[in-house]
């Protein structure tokens, strides 16, 4: 019982530490392996986060209101006498309740369940012949980045191992602005025209009458959308249940335009190839984990970074000239189609290393926004109708 109350007090201290606007920045607790060595692979760092925070922080004299004012107690309100009503002048009570009432935001319509991490992108190959993007201007250049991984259709709190595509959203903090590359773990998509997107998403949500998932609605839509077949075949293979977020690739899905310093332009597609390999769960394994550890993928990512086993991806691009695009037998701007690698081979660009966990999930991850229209000099949109709709 005593430990239960200690846990409640510690949780309140964590809340007040986040709320105090004049507080000092906490020391990071995410990377115990400062020398780059890998920690215990069997240790659940996510489950030990509160205990780790307690050991690395002195909780004395840090209980504050949202304006940074010291607070003597969060266990009792000001009252008129021992049994009297509470006082309207109790700023601490009102501040606490106001914060509680407003601390959440509406969940994302899609990609509501997700995990994220901070990292660094390093250029390994010269691609200035294709683009003048600041983050790619020279070999060895380093750019901070932020990646968010997610399922697509599930509501907040649902299992992150469900059979579903995985969102693979990237934000690069370049010297010429933030570049958002919003992709998936699969190289194609269900539809090619953005006007179909609202109807498609509705089929992934609850039936408006029964408030239950409805496979009939989904298959009605997909059966009338034959271009979705390439995506369906992937989602209903083991690719639809990757073993966590680290052991899967990422794809920009859409075609983009790259422009170099001379004003010359080519089309391109982005690929992120996992250095952790490609490991998937079987349907049985995914179903079991959804019931026993619905946050399995989030836990796996957090623990890997916490023990110093930093996940890495190699960025590669496919390049297509305007002349090649004009001679193709298919539409290269159709998000339901692949560019054949034998005709448009992968070109190495750089490597991403995720090396820091979020310190405040709501602040760092839940409030993170990714906008496909956030581009920087050197990259432009293509005629891809689905990409245009995202703008």
Predicted regions and their residues:
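Active-site-adjacent core segments of small-molecule enzymes
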Residues: 2-5, 18-391
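N-terminal signal peptide c-region/cleavage motif recognized by signal peptidases
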Residues: 14-16
